[in-house]
Amino acid sequence: MAADVSVTHRPPLSPKSGAEVEAGDAAERRAPEEELPPLDPEEIRKRLEHTERQFRNRRKILIRGLPGDVTNQEVHDLLSDYELKYCFVDKYKGTAFVTLLNGEQAEAAINAFHQSRLRERELSVQLQPTDALLCVANLPPSLTQQQFEELVRPFGSLERCFLVYSERTGQSKGYGFAEYMKKDSAARAKSDLLGKPLGPRTLYVHWTDAGQLTPALLHSRCLCVDRLPPGFNDVDALCRALSAVHSPTFCQLACGQDGQLKGFAVLEYETAEMAEEAQQQADGLSLGGSHLRVSFCAPGPPGRSMLAALIAAQATALNRGKGLLPEPNILQLLNNLGPSASLQLLLNPLLHGSAGGKQGLLGAPPAMPLLNGPALSTALLQLALQTQGQKKPGILGDSPLGALQPGAQPANPLLGELPAGGGLPPELPPRRGKPPPLLPSVLGPAGGDREALGLGPPAAQLTPPPAPVGLRGSGLRGPLSHFYSGSPTSYFTSGLQAGLKQSHLSKAIGSSPLGSGEGLLGLSPGPNGHSHLLKVRAGGGDMQGWEAPAPQRPLTRPALPSVSRPHWAARNAALPTCCPRPSPAQKAAMWASTPRASAATTRTPT
């Protein structure tokens, strides 16, 4: 495990103007971001050995040319001298995927069984190609091996993980490699680490072809120069500043598709050693009042390809956390909101900003172009206050009565004002020109009559809903007001009345359901003051002497006739004519002629 390296920061030095830059002056003018102390030879050797060991630790091999009926046990017997961690045999393709203990066993198995024969078939043994190798660049030079492992380990199981060090100084070159067991883990790591800030730097992550990566290609020949002066576009001056030791073969400033400068440049040298020397001399160099930061790019691609990759990576890092669609402007947000919400949003800084010192969602009022004039501000303020003073709509939305003019509203409310307890008012006064409420007569007797019949206390009277066409009397034939039908209050009233009617009609079938004006079917009452509907007898007795049945014998509501003629007339027409009542003389004669055998049988001798 690599040891921790202390970091010292040197303050930036002011550049000398109007003089030629000499070698000694250039060294004094350098202000690198991190000045690392020199390492002892033993520490350098340990770091280089760890990097080489991890680089060669490819323990997965691929065996081709196996017979079609080969079994898993035969592959185990073939590699019996090695320690197998995983083995999968594909009989259809004649291949086997094997994971050994380490890279040394994999190299030994390749040397032993490559181009050997199994059942007269030649085998091909090689390292498995991998597509889960990442190169993480632009790391801080002081980052240790342990810290790098902690950075990349949360995304999945690691196969290899190592930093690349300088062979001369043993210091980190600012990039490392991480190979995962699965490709989806590597893809997740690339997505999360790309553009992630780590200290003063922003990480760049690239896919790497493990087959083309050799020990010599671990060291990069390209340098990335950032922290250029604002608006710097002199490529020749940059090349001269970085050509003090070796001249680059490629030097270009980064520009976007719109021609805007990106603030960094990429240089490529002939060898990795030249690039390392140029980096050590140019890191922290003053140019145009800014101290350059020179770091190594990911190894492998040439300078031109690396420049395009860094431009794309920078764009991805800048768009990190943003959606696919562009951010809407203020006018689009206000158009999507309603007038009340827009006014409240605009005037929130004016109403609450002065008291608490807080700004609204859109910032301070002076920054809003819609509130420039004082007259407009005053008008918007008055309109906002009026909007806040308005009554909020209910659950069912705005009431239809709100759209009526004051003169068109009814004199009395539909249900009256509910008391604090939540109950209904005991009685509503009738309106002028309207019939009296019919709901109590439909629900049965009220007041003392209900208590006498055992029906419980009287229910609260309500204004009835409009009666159907077939049940309307002469007093309800006029058209109803438009606010009696269709409003949320009328829906509530009709539903409540229907429930009360259903519950009370089952108890009050013996009482008159009719009012004093006329019958339920439009018939006038009889001569005795009762409706024809009450002439039906129950059990041979009059309905006027009927008592409430016991609770265990519920009564059902009798079906109403469908014609205006009372149904008792048809029934009485079918009854036979009764005999005349006998006179008292006839009764006495009949009594005298009746034998009295019971008198003789009841007497006993004395």
Swiss-Prot record:
Residues that bear Phosphothreonine: T463
Record InterPro entries: Euk_RNA-bind_prot, Nucleotide-bd_a/b_plait_sf, RAVER1_RRM1, RAVER1_RRM3, RBD_domain_sf, RRM_dom
tRNA-binding as UniProt keyword: no
Nucleus among keywords: yes
UniProt superkingdom: Eukaryota
Annotated spans, Disordered: 1-41, 391-474, 519-564, 579-606
UniProt motif Nuclear localization signal: location: 45-60
Cell location: Nucleus; Cytoplasm
Key words, A-Z: Acetylation, Cytoplasm, Nucleus, Phosphoprotein, Repeat, RNA-binding
Compositional bias per record (Low complexity), positions renumbered to this chain: 453-462, 592-606
Subunit details: Interacts with PTBP1, RAVER2, VCL and ACTN1. Part of a complex containing RAVER1, VCL and ACTN1.
Listed name of the protein: Ribonucleoprotein PTB-binding 1
